[in-house]
Amino acid sequence: MHTLNKREFLAAGIGAGLGLTALRSASAQGKASGANNIRSSRRAKTTKLFRSPEGFPNAVAVTSEGLWIAEQKLSGSAAAQYHMAEPKDLTEHAWLVDWSGKVLKTVSTQSRNTSGMAVGGGYVWMCANQSPEGVFQVDMNSKQISHRQIPLGPSDNGGGCHGAMWHDGKLWIAALRLRGLLRVDPVSWQPEFFIPFYDAPDRARYHAMAWDNGAIWQIVGNDCKNHSQYRPALVKYDAATGRVMELIEFEPDSADPHGLAMNDGALISCDAGIHPGWENNDSPSSHWIFRIDLV
């Protein structure tokens, strides 16, 4: 199967019937040659808040009721990759907790290797990162409403997801196959807007995103072998143009950020406890929910 590169994706007829606005100017904005222009003197500092419920917390979302946390379970090839036993129960949960970590509500889903979540429109949107892939739309009583693949891919496999968010009635997906942030109408499931991932040799890992007053923050990081070698950063995009506005590196020995959400002007994240290439629970903040302050 041919995977479209960024130039092909933006130029090869995307606007012809797909309803997607191509951000050609954004495709070059994150190249390493321009990285110094956006690199900030600010730093991201992490502060632990509370431990997540059982399992691997791999996505977060904020609503008026509290904080939602998505559970990731490792099954099949993912369990083998991390040398873990196959779970007896493959159900992956979304927990609503208060700001002390007390569980207020649990929603059960059939998502697999959940790596993104949004909450909006009366539903939880759980994003799978292994077969059967796609986005699981589940109501607050754990009834599955739909299971649909990320748009612009094969009908049975739109690729993996590493983040999601809900804003103004639209679902945003961090689409790994497309290598960008894709805005989708949640009813028609038509793609509407696309922002290419920030592109730099030392930032090859992409995670979740959060809305911030007309801008979007996304977690990026480097491939490495352990927590001490990890250099995560926050990229800030202009949500209207896709232009990269700022790159903020985390302080050394910070928590390992996976999910991302905004709460009263502060970024909230989670440390799943597993990371490709690392020993399990190598991060000292494994399974913690934490706040990110920009200092």
Predicted regions, residues:
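A short helix->beta-strand "capping" segment at the edge of beta-propeller domains
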Residues: 34-53
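Short loop/turn segments that connect beta-strands within beta-propeller blades
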Residues: 98-101, 139-143, 185-189, 238-242, ...
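Conserved beta-strand positions in repeat-built beta-propeller and related beta-rich domains
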Residues: 53, 69-78, 86-88, 126-131, ...
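Beta-rich, blade/repeat-based domains predominating
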Residues: 54-62, 111-120, 153-167, 200-214, ...
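N-terminal secretory signal peptides and thylakoid transit peptides that target proteins
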Residues: 1-16
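Blade-level signature of beta-propeller repeat domains, shared across WD40, Kelch, NHL, RCC1
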Residues: 261-295
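A short loop-to-beta-strand structural motif that recurs across blades of beta-propeller domains
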Residues: 92-95, 134-136, 180-182, 232-235, ...
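A short beta-strand motif characteristic of beta-propeller blades
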Residues: 45-50, 102-107, 144-154, 190-199, ...
